[in-house]
Amino acid sequence: MNIFVTDPSPTVSAQVLPDKHIVKMPLESCQMLAIVCSEKWGHGYGEIHKKDGEPYKTDKGAFRGHPCTVWANESNINAWWLVAHAMALCEEYTHRYGKVHSCENTVLEAGHLIPFTLERPKSFAFAGPDEFKYDTSIDTFTAYKRYISSKPWVAFNYLRDPSRPVSYTHLTLPTRIR
């Protein structure tokens, strides 16, 4: 569970992610949005539904305490950024794989339920290793870029669209991480 916020723009943030994240992050976004929309744990906007028509189960509130879910649930501003990012992830999935992601309609449904705002988030949550989380010399965007680039598979995980790898996949990591 995470929102890999590599840029203030939800679209740019999605476009630079490796294939692995493009495939799995729309589902994680939908799980967070289901909590945001739920009556019990969120704002009571209504249920959002999976591709098969079944509503996401939110009665136990799974993931409600995750830093990214807490962040998304703090305001409509944050929730709308997540909707825009999830939609951008789905569009990127279509761009790379030539088909529609199974979560796309769920993201659209959440977008219809959550009250719209044009405002942008003032801050973002970081859910990652301590060596990035507590580095006060970097912002959240850089922390996520370093976290992603620390994975040995990342540089080779842009097979669907080789034009998408970005310069941060070649960052020199601090010695304590290497």
Residue ranges and their predicted role:
Residues 1-93:
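An N-terminal structural lobe/cap that precedes and organizes the functional/catalytic core
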Residues 80-114:
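Charge-dense polyanion-binding interfaces
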Residues 103-147, 153:
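An amphipathic alpha-helical core segment
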Residues 149, 159-161:
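C-terminal accessory extensions appended to soluble enzyme cores
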Residues 166-168:
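Short, compositionally biased segments
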Residues 170-178:
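Single conserved hydrophobic/aromatic residue that forms the stacking wall/gate
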